[in-house]
Curated annotation (Swiss-Prot):
Glycosylation sites: N617
Signal sequence, start to end: 1-28
The keyword ATP-binding belongs to this UniProt entry's keyword annotation: yes
Any single GO CC term annotated in Swiss-Prot or TrEMBL for this entry: endoplasmic reticulum lumen
Function according to Swiss-Prot or TrEMBL: Probably plays a role in facilitating the assembly of multimeric protein complexes inside the ER.
Annotated organism of origin: Solanum lycopersicum (Tomato)
Protein name: Luminal-binding protein
């Protein structure tokens, strides 16, 4: 590193890049004119949720299974791609092709210790590509494909987008997507890229605890309040301390751990039972993906039950070698297994309190967010830390983040109305940003918890005589040496006129907009020459070409999904019609007593042949099912019409019944 900046006449090194932190002034009327309805998506490690601001309030939207949260799981079978419940339900029988916890990979490097640890715990294959973790999976017809974490996240975002579109009855292009407050620059940008691949304009990235604070404070009037948001989800943990004052949400401090959550608690339960099975049965199931899939499902179920019960029995049929598994698990044992992890959550709470400069008695409300905050021991630790203060039960921990994101969406689209017009978000950069100076020192430029949007300038000069280029290394982190911080990349400033060291004055300006997007401009004060600086691609971002390719592939998958659904619908239509016919000709209240014997025989023959054909043609195409339906209708409909005409009723029994019963079968 050969650059120095200067205050007065002294040389100092400089530079910086700003973290894609998130949210901003909400009165964005100029944005509202360009945006349609903006949905809010909580893209979670284990579950995702979508909401929309509509008719003066937030609607959290249920998926096609009727659930308001959707598992962040994707699975591939020989015939189709599954997302959500359908994928998770297949995990035990299709482990190597079922992908989950991808949020723990997004924006990370392959050699990150968290990635290396997770590789040993998941049944699917994680491989290195361009220094990033990719997921290798067999899709169909034996074809093996690698997906970036962004692509898998995009599939989940697409599911949430389609859920909203089904509810609203229109195409959605714009979304607010949430990220953990402690996500770094690369993780934020990767999340935004996932939105692009899903066909979404990510109008804003906002921090999860800030979104939850909006959900809590939207209808809170009156004086200033300090709130602490404790957000412990499936895979990540955040603590944010905010001041709320009549619609102004100002983040004072944030802290967290992007690799701590419910999945880790499940893993401890699994490890306990794996050891128990080895001890009792002499069987090691740690490499048996099917057994682990079943155990993972039951570990999560047991953990949830222990939030309201003191003991559960974990029972799994034929877990290994045809052996059934049945063991008790007490809440006390569960707490003992996870004691260190539960206590680990208190560290960020203390740091955030110190950074905010608040005493415990100055926190007015504690807001719990994320499913893992239902764990009694976690609540007890928090209560003890705050000298007996009870946490607020005012928000739904599963839905609060999507709720706040939907409010922000309503503001950006202009659909929020009077209820949201006074809301102002002042969020912060969670990590210190700085540059490397001589000796590998981390020179801080933007301290953590700086309110964004922000704009900072600094004057550079040269370190050597006749130097025409300055190389600037940018880092994020809290340590004093850059080797202990995360390298965000570097940029070169070229074309400096040759001069003695310390002579040139180059002003570099770092500006972060409301989306947390960084613009860097450099100007030679001597010549007036200015140029934009682009951070190099060191931080593992997808290139524009890669994103465009992934968008195309996502569209191809969507087209395939559509064809699969059309095929299923066509098969269901045929089955429904055939069974309706069978029921009608055997039901005395319908057609049984009105048919001539030869008419009944014709219908019975046609329906029997159709059912046999269905059994023999499981993988037929949509057109085949449509054609078969026409054949059966050609036999049955004229008979039904004749019967109704004979009895003086309106024709159409079969057809109208089909219309009545044409709902998708579960």
């Amino acid at each position: 590193m050969a650059a120095c900046s200067r205050r007065g006449n002294s040389l100092v090194v400089l530079a910086i890049v700003l973290l894609g932190c998130l949210s901003a002034l909400s009165n964005a009327k100029e944005e509202a004119t360009k945006l349609g309805t903006v949905i809010g998506i909580d893209l979670g490690t284990t579950y995702s949720c979508v909401g929309v601001y509509k008719n003066g309030h937030v609607e959290i939207i249920a998926n096609d299974q009727g659930n308001r949260i959707t598992p962040s799981w994707v699975a591939f079978t020989d015939n189709e791609r599954l997302i959500g419940e359908a994928a998770k339900n297949l995990a035990a029988v299709n482990p190597e092709r079922t992908i989950f916890d991808v949020k723990r990979l997004i924006g990370r490097k392959f050699e990150d210790k968290e990635v290396q640890r997770d590789m040993k715990l998941v049944p699917y294959k994680i491989v290195s590509k361009d220094g990033k973790p990719y997921i290798q999976v067999k899709i169909k017809d034996g074809e093996v494909k690698v997906f970036s974490p962004e692509e898998i996240s995009a599939m989940i975002l697409t599911k949430m987008k389609e859920t909203a579109e089904a509810f609203l009855g229109k195409t959605i292009k714009d979304a607010v997507v949430t990220v953990p407050a402690y996500f770094n620059d690369a993780q934020r940008q990767a999340t935004k890229d996932a939105g692009v691949i899903a066909g979404l304009n990510v109008a804003r990235i906002i921090n999860e605890p800030t979104a939850a604070a909006i959900a809590y404070g939207l209808d809170k009037k009156g004086g200033e309040k300090n709130i602490l948001v404790f957000d412990l989800g499936g895979g990540t943990f955040d603590v944010s301390i905010l001041t709320i004052d009549n619609g102004v949400f100002e983040v004072l401090a944030t802290n967290g751990d992007t690799h701590l959550g419910g999945e880790d608690f499940d893993q401890r339960i699994m490890e306990y039972f794996i050891k128990l099975i080895k001890k009792k049965h002499g069987k090691d199931i740690s490499k048996d993906n099917r057994a682990l899939g079943k155990l993972r499902r039951e570990a999560e179920r047991a953990k949830r039950s222990l939030s309201s019960q003191h003991q559960v029995r974990v029972e799994i049929e034929s877990l290994f070698d045809g052996t059934d598994f049945s063991e008790p698990l007490t809440r006390a044992r569960f707490e003992e297994l996870n004691n260190d992890l539960f206590r680990k959550t208190m560290g960020p709470v203390k740091k955030a309190m110190d950074d905010a400069g608040l005493q415990k008695n100055q926190i007015d409300e504690i807001v719990l967010v994320g499913g893992s905050t239902r764990i009694p021991k976690v609540q007890q630790l928090l209560k003890d830390y705050f000298d007996g203060k009870e946490p607020s039960k005012g928000v739904n921990p599963d839905e609060a983040v999507a709720y706040g994101a939907a409010v922000q969406g309503g503001i950006l689209s202009g659909e929020g109305g009077d209820e949201t017009k006074d809301i102002l978000l002042l969020d912060v950069a969670p990590l210190t940003l700085g540059i490397e100076t001589v000796g590998g020192v981390m020179t801080k430029f933007i301290p953590r918890n700086t309110v964004i949007p922000t704009k900072k300038s600094q004057v550079f000069t040269t370190y050597q005589d006749q130097q025409t280029t300055v190389s600037i290394q940018v880092f994020e982190g809290e340590r004093s040496l850059t080797k202990d911080c995360r390298n965000l990349g570097k940029f070169d400033l070229t074309g400096i006129p040759p001069a003695p060291r310390g002579t040139p004055q180059i002003e570099v300006t770092f500006e972060v907009d409301a989306n947390g997007i960084l613009n860097v401009k450099a100007e030679d004060k001597g010549t007036g020459k200015a140029e934009k600086i682009t951070i190099t691609n060191d931080k593992g971002r997808l290139s524009q070409e890669e994103i465009e390719r992934m968008v195309r592939e996502a569209e191809e998958f969507a087209e395939e999904d559509k064809k699969v659904k059309e095929k299923i619908d066509a098969r269901n239509a045929l089955e429904t019609y055939v069974y309706n016919m069978k029921n009608q000709i055997n039901d005395k209240d319908k057609l049984a007593d009105k048919l001539e014997s030869d008419e009944k025989e014709k219908i019975e023959t046609a329906t029997k042949e159709a059912l046999e054909w269905l059994d023999d043609n499981q993988s037929a195409e949509k057109e085949d099912y449509d054609e078969k339906l026409k054949e059966v209708e050609a036999v049955c409909n004229p008979i039904i019409t004749a019967v109704y005409q004979r009895s003086g009723g309106a024709p159409g029994g079969g057809a109208s019944e089909e219309e009545d019963d044409s709902h998708d079968e579960l």
